[in-house]
């Protein structure tokens, strides 16, 4: 994997985002028990096994510097299971409570109607704007129009809810 600084820009932004939230939580809870650690909930929504692996790698990179300062919980959901109403609804509720949602997919892929429906359900359940949405893509591909359309849609979902939106490209982990 290319270890360039640019490759980890979104991860660094998320670390900063978490650090700011951690600082805010610490300031708000000055009188509470010192053993209480802030909890960060993360939901990964992934297209397939390779996308799930990339997302988990990205998640590990983001939390590496912060794991001693706060607790993290992680839920992983595959695009395909989101189409099952009971599972999709459970995933949407969990993701609505998440501090950040990582959507990991292939650059060439368009979001299916079922995945877009799920994104609309999820975004409709967000109560506050303290979340972040991360679009995690594999290495650059040829179909720029497809990814631009998908990223534009995701940015609009985030903008409607007033949540932070990040994009990140991660290179194929199998080439390491």
Enumerate the language-model features and the residues they cover.
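Short N-terminal or domain-adjacent regulatory/targeting segments
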Residues: 2-39, 114-119, 176
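A short, flexible N-terminal coil/short beta segment enriched in small residues
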Residues: 25-63
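Hydrophobic beta-strand segments of well-ordered beta-sheets in folded domains
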Residues: 38-43, 100-102, 128-138, 164-166
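A short, gly/pro- and small-residue-rich
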Residues: 109-130
């Amino acid at each position: 994997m290319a270890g360039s600084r640019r490759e980890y820009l979104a991860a660094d932004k998320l670390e900063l985002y978490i650090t700011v939230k951690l600082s805010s939580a610490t300031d708000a809870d000055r009188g509470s028990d010192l053993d209480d650690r802030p909890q960060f909930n993360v939901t990964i929504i992934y297209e397939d096994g390779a996308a799930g692996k990339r997302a988990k790698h990205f998640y590990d990179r983001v939390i590496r510097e912060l794991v001693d300062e706060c607790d993290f919980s992680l839920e992983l959901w595959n695009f395909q299971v989101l189409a099952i109403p009971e599972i999709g609804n459970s995933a949407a509720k969990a993701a609505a409570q998440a501090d950040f949602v990582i959507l990991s997919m292939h650059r060439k892929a368009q979001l299916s109607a079922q995945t877009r429906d799920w994104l609309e359900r999820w975004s409709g359940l967000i109560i506050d704007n303290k979340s972040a949405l991360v679009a995690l893509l594999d290495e650059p591909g040829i179909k720029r129009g497809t990814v631009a359309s998908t990223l534009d849609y995701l940015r609009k979902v985030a903008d409607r809810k007033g949540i932070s939106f990040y994009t990140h490209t991660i290179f194929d982990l199998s080439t390491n």
